[in-house]
Every structure is written in structure tokens, then in C-alpha cells.
A protein has these predicted regions:
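Helix-to-loop junction immediately C-terminal to a conserved catalytic motif
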Residues: 28-29
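Catalytic Walker B motif of ABC-type/P-loop ATPase nucleotide-binding domains
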Residues: 122-126
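Hydrophobic anchor residue at the start of the ABC signature
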Residues: 111
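Q-loop/switch helix immediately C-terminal to the Walker
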Residues: 56, 63-82
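The feature captures the beta-strand-to-loop junction immediately N-terminal to the Walker
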Residues: 14-16
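Conserved ABC transporter NBD signature motif
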Residues: 33-46, 53
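Conserved ABC ATPase signature
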Residues: 97-101, 105
Length: 184
């Protein structure tokens, strides 16, 4: 399979569960063994060390499992994290224990942690699956603002076609681990 996501653009990726969407994101992020080639701005993944590649690629899994005990431990510099920007009404969230957060709060925290690393590419696997409509809109706006401000390329996986129409410029459909169609 072959496709291009230009800097500052978002590709929406849909398909049934098990069609290979997450496998594709994990392969691009170099988290699983794969045989393809991926490039960022013309530089092949093979020219980077694994850690340097993963600094350029921000992967947000459908459910983040790697957490420090407190929210604040996820941010080297708390100035990079504005809780209000991510829908937290109380700035004291930085002192909170992660295991006391709801799944939606953890999802927004995972996005904040991801964006604080300033990746050039965002790989978002169902980034709004655990969110209410208000926070879904908030995340869509945050990613759009980040994409526009930093020129990041984004691959956004979702089952919600209307969401993909809102957030992406190009949409692809996966079926049986293959790209089937390109809808504009």
C-alpha cells in the first residue's frame, strides 16, 4: 500500500474492526516489526535511529496504558501543559493521581502528553472514542490547531465517518489490511 500525507494535512482512515488500521499506525510508528518504508519530508525511516524516529512520530493509541502515578509526572515542564486547553476545569489536575481519572480524562491527558513532545506526525487511533460531544469537539479543535500551527501531518483513525469528513482533507478505507478506496 502507498499513500502520502502532506505536512499540515490530515488523512482520515476508516474500516471495520480488525481491518488493519491500528497495525498500520503501529508500523508507521516503528512499534511493530514491518517490511515497509516510511518517509518524513523525504527522509526514510531507515536513516533514523529508532528513538529519533519515535520523537518525530506521535502515536496516540485507542487506550493509553503507560502512566506515571500523577498527572504532573507526564510533563517535564508544566508550562507546556495548560489544563484548561484540554478541557480540565481545575488547574490542580496537575496534582491528581492518574488512576483516579475517568477514561475520557485519561484520553485528553494522553493527547496533551503527545502534543507536548511536538511531533511532526500525529498517528491518532480513535482519539475521541471515550469522549462526550463537548470534549470530542475540543479534541478536534486542538488537533486542527496543532496541525495548522506546527505543520504536522496527521493520520486520524475513526469509525465515525462524519467526524472524518470534519477533520480530514483525504479519507482512505481499509479492508482486510488493504487500502480500498480514496474519497475526497
Amino acid at each position: 500500500m502507498s499513500f502520502i500525507v502532506d505536512s499540515g494535512k490530515c488523512l482520515g482512515l476508516s474500516g471495520q474492526s480488525g481491518s488493519g488500521k491500528t497495525l498500520l499506525l503501529r508500523a508507521i510508528a516503528d512499534l511493530d516489526l514491518n517490511h515497509g518504508e516510511v518517509s518524513i519530508k523525504g527522509k526514510k525511516r531507515s536513516s533514523f535511529s529508532g528513538p529519533n524516529w519515535r520523537k518525530k512520530i506521535g502515536y496516540l493509541p485507542a487506550e493509553s496504558k503507560r502512566w506515571h502515578s500523577s498527572v504532573g509526572q507526564h510533563f517535564d515542564n508544566a508550562e507546556n501543559f495548560s489544563p484548561e486547553d484540554f478541557g480540565f476545569s481545575d488547574a490542580s489536575i496537575i496534582e491528581s493521581e492518574v488512576d483516579k481519572l475517568s477514561s475520557g480524562e485519561k484520553q485528553r491527558l494522553a493527547l496533551a502528553r503527545l502534543l507536548s513532545g511536538l511531533p511532526e506526525v500525529l498517528l491518532l487511533d480513535e482519539p475521541t472514542a471515550n469522549l462526550d460531544p463537548h470534549n470530542t469537539n475540543l479534541v478536534e479543535e486542538l488537533v486542527n490547531d496543532y496541525r495548522n500551527t506546527h505543520g504536522a501531518a496527521v493520520i486520524w483513525v475513526a469509525h465515525n465517518e462524519s467526524q472524518l469528513v470534519r477533520v480530514s482533507q483525504t479519507r482512505l478505507l481499509m479492508k482486510n489490511k488493504s487500502l480500498l478506496s480514496n474519497e475526497n
